[in-house]
């Protein structure tokens, strides 16, 4: 093997396999674009995003790490969320949870 060389196995990688997901419609009611990152606790996103907020407690976007979804002003789109894993404790973000889910 050459230093830095990748040995990639054939096949697909399935993200978040076996975790509960939720599909919902989200609308940007504001006048500015809003971008939400892959690991942001969706329950705590910008208040200008309109959706069933209580249903999203303990969930994040079901997209690849390091990516984001952008909502343009007036735009409505379907997104898929996935349950947070690990210890299921949330601190920071908008400060709406600050502890166990």
From Swiss-Prot:
The keyword Acetylation does not apply. It comes from Pseudomonas paraeruginosa (strain DSM 24068 / PA7) (Pseudomonas aeruginosa (strain PA7)). Pathway: Nitrogen metabolism; urea degradation; CO(2) and NH(3) from urea (urease route): step 1/1. This is Urease subunit beta. GO terms for molecular function: urease activity. It is an enzyme of class 3 (hydrolase). Its main location: cytoplasm. GO terms for biological process: urea catabolic process. Belongs to the urease beta subunit family.
């Amino acid at each position: 093997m050459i230093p830095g060389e990748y040995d990639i196995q054939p096949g697909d990688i399935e993200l978040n396999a076996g975790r509960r997901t939720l599909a919902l419609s989200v609308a940007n009611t504001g006048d500015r674009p809003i971008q939400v990152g892959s690991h942001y606790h969706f329950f705590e996103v910008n208040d200008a995003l309109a959706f069933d907020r209580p249903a999203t407690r303990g969930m994040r976007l079901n997209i690849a790490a390091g990516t984001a979804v952008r909502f343009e002003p007036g735009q409505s789109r379907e997104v898929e969320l996935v349950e947070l894993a690990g210890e299921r404790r949330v601190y920071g973000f908008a400060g709406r949870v600050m502890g166990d889910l």
